[in-house]
Amino acid sequence: MSTVKLDRLTSIDAQLRLLAPKKVSEDDKLIEYDALLLDRFLDILQNLHGEDIKETVQELYEQSAEYERTHDPKKLEELGSMVTSLDAGDSIVVAKSFSHMLNLANLAEEVQISRRKRVKKVKKGDFMDENTAMTESDMEETLRRLIVDLKKSPQEIFETLKNQTVDLVFTAHPTQSVRRSLLQKHGRIRDCLAQLYAKDITPDDKQELDEALQREIQAAFRTDEIRRTQPTPQDEMRAGMSYFHETIWNGVPKFLRRLDTALKNIGITERVPYNAPLIQFSSWMGGDRDGNPRVTPEVTRDVCLLARMMAANMYFSQIDELMFELSMWRCTDELRERAEELHKYSKRDSKHYIEFWKQIPSSEPYRVILADVRDKLYYTRERSRQLLASEVSEIPVEATFTEIDQFLEPLELCYRSLCACGDRPVADGSLLDFMRQVATFGLCLVKLDIRQESERHTDVMDAITTHLGIGSYRDWTEEKRQDWLLSELRGKRPLFGPDLPRTDEIADVLDTINVIAELPSDSFGAYVISMATAPSDVLAVELLQRECKVKKPLRVVPLFEKLADLEAAPASMTRLFSVDWYKNRIDGKQEVMIGYSDSGKDAGRLSAAWQMYKVQEELLKVSKKFGVKLTMFHGRGGTVGRGGGPTHLAILAQPAETIGGSLRVTIQGEVIEQSFGEQHLCFRTLQRYTAATLEHGMNPPKSPKPEWRALLDQMAVVATEEYRSIVFKEPRFVEYFRLATPETEYGRMNIGSRPSKRKPSGGIESLRAIPWIFAWTQTRFHLPVWLGVGGALKHVLEKDIRNHNMLRDMYNNFPFFRVTIDLLEMVFAKGDPEIAALYDKLLVSEELQSFGERLRANYEDTKRRLLEVAGHKDLLEGDPYLKQRLRLRDPYITTLNVCQAYTLKRIRDPDFKVTERPHLSKEIMDAHKAAAELVKLNPTSEYAPGLEDTLILTMKGVAAGLQNTG
């Protein structure tokens, strides 16, 4: 082997140290973790595909690392020549390798973050990134601040805490680009790495863990990263529910127990009541039909039954353990009477149980009670299973649990009895954990929200009024619609019969509401109306629920998304609250959802964020005026462009009183894995939401000064105008966007069940927010996040020199503005206009090149002004740890970007000529044919062999590297 080859074997480790030459702190082992995982992977790569492939990967990395140091565009061209010279099989192997290395880098980072938090608290203000936003002692730190700094009493804190609610809503937004098969393997790699660096590890343990690590890395690399079929809504629901089984189910009682301990440490001897609604879970998976024709009424029914079956099964799997624990004979008379009554009717053996299958003696009264609970859980599970399989069940409803109170009553009886007999420590063990699970998850595991677009309800109403011969509802004014809807809601007559003419769309809406009427009411949460614009949107759904005989109507939640709809939201809610019928219907409680994604796409991030801040304030005023308790439902995505950002700071930056102890927020796509993929992540997530909601309520942020508001209003007007002048008013912008990004190829990733557009044809307006953000994220340009900000800053700074100091004051003293600017800074740190320029050079026609040049100049100007406002010389100078992490992963992402840009060129331009060098892994092809076999995984591709898979792998890799998709 040549000296050059020998040198290359250690080159990536050396490059890592050059990119991040010094440790950020004494506990920093990130480079060590990174180097170990890469070393193991490169050995595996050589064993599977040969030494030449390994050297090629290392050479590409070196070139990319050199580009990161110099930012010389020629280096990108050299990288391009290298990747285009690879044949189909080798191209897939290389793209797969870099994507895999980025996933390994993420895992190294997660282990380092977990270790860092155990060793040392993160310094105050280090919050740009979710992982460094707060320490593991969030709850204790929050309680300390409230008591020491704000002089709140422990009892006041306890009363506030036990009455607050955080509802986390899992959605199937198609942003999770990593397959579940790989996520599980990644979890095992993470565990192996963490254990390898444990202090008390023996040499034998170390050897076995190293072998296990290599095994899992190889298994992950050998797994096809690409979903070959599009997931169904049922697939998405099962994937989402797997987190409950793996982390959330046991994570909730663990978190609540830690909360008890934190409260005890401040002098509260009472435990958080088991039925305090601190944490709740909801889901849109199988209920969100907005723009997704695959979510049918049958899907909704199946998803609800599956969730009930899963819940009963998880309770059932724990009940034996509880029966083992509650073996005591001493009990209250109340419990003994119940046990004796049950004992009379339970003479038979139960051979289908493993434990306690014979009749339980009356001297074990708690077990007698729990055996009856177990029987009902068994039948509850089996009835759901049968209904799911064949739509009928031989098991009578009476043998099952149908109401949560039926389930809790015998458990409460056991708890009361244990406490009365001096066994409170036993009662506060597994029984309390179990009761907390029942109170949190109920019989349905999660409550399913239904989401439908307002236009679909208008279609139904139009069909009804036309059928009744009273005109076209669609043509009526808003006032006439409201008058008619209210007259029907106040009346008793049926509105339509089976003879109502129905299109498929109308049948879908009505059949969905019929499913709501058919299934147990505790299966459902809210009925969310997307693209809501007026009070009639809400009243129409209320009327449809009544017509379909929904016994316990779902609360109706308008979702205001576009800028104009957000501005009109307070007036809409004022009108609704003024209606006596509606006021009586809501019983003093109203939920309103605001959408971060579509508002950002409509007006740009800055304008949308400020408008949502103001609309929350206005909605709060309206609610207070009418004596209504308002709950804001935040439709946040994972990326900054879709409202993402560190949880704690995002909550604390909301206007004062708008949370008020009640918060709903979506947990979307890849954010589910980042929040609940591991036990410690689950614990951290529950802690952050609870702590931030408590702190916001007890220490509300100060309202911005009038002059700050005026300045932000000016900035929003300018930012919106600049954003729309390009995105919506430039006649050829859509053409440029589709050429300069992989937007048209997005659907090939098969990462979600819904189409990327609400309507098959149309421009940016009909494009969903996720592919819009996804496409710009892939090219590292992040246009939707920053476009308009530079123009806004320029306008106010040039208008009045004093605005410079005012902006600096806002940055230091206004949490909303601080978080907005810091998140923009983080996005710029992840961006690279030279990469975007490469896409333009290769993919954009000559007459449209000026678009990119103009936008890149705007990008640089915006970045400069942003740093000026923040008082920073360099990006992320206040967060060296995040800066280090981004620098370490940039060379991988850059290689994938170059590979992606050239692959898109080859796909879109059949005349693009490349010179392939001979197959790199020739020496082992005869034995394994590994690279060639990868090409065969996609036999039906419409493109030249290997191109489509290479493209998809680069998209997945870039998403993993930036830790954002859409």
From Swiss-Prot:
It catalyses: oxaloacetate + phosphate = phosphoenolpyruvate + hydrogencarbonate. Its main location: cytoplasm. One of its GO terms (biological process) is carbon fixation. GO terms for molecular function: phosphoenolpyruvate carboxylase activity. Induction: By salt stress. Its EC number is 4.1.1.31. Gene3D superfamilies: Phosphoenolpyruvate/pyruvate domain. It comes from the Eukaryota. The active site is at residues 173, 601. The modification Phosphoserine is found at residue 11. Its cofactor is Mg(2+). It is found in: Cytoplasm. Homotetramer. This isozyme is from salt-induced (CAM) plants. Belongs to the PEPCase type 1 family. Through the carboxylation of phosphoenolpyruvate (PEP) it forms oxaloacetate, a four-carbon dicarboxylic acid source for the tricarboxylic acid cycle. PANTHER family: PHOSPHOENOLPYRUVATE CARBOXYLASE, PHOSPHOENOLPYRUVATE CARBOXYLASE 2. This is Phosphoenolpyruvate carboxylase 1. It comes from Mesembryanthemum crystallinum (Common ice plant). The lineage of its organism: Eukaryota, Viridiplantae, Streptophyta, Embryophyta, Tracheophyta. The gene is PPCA.
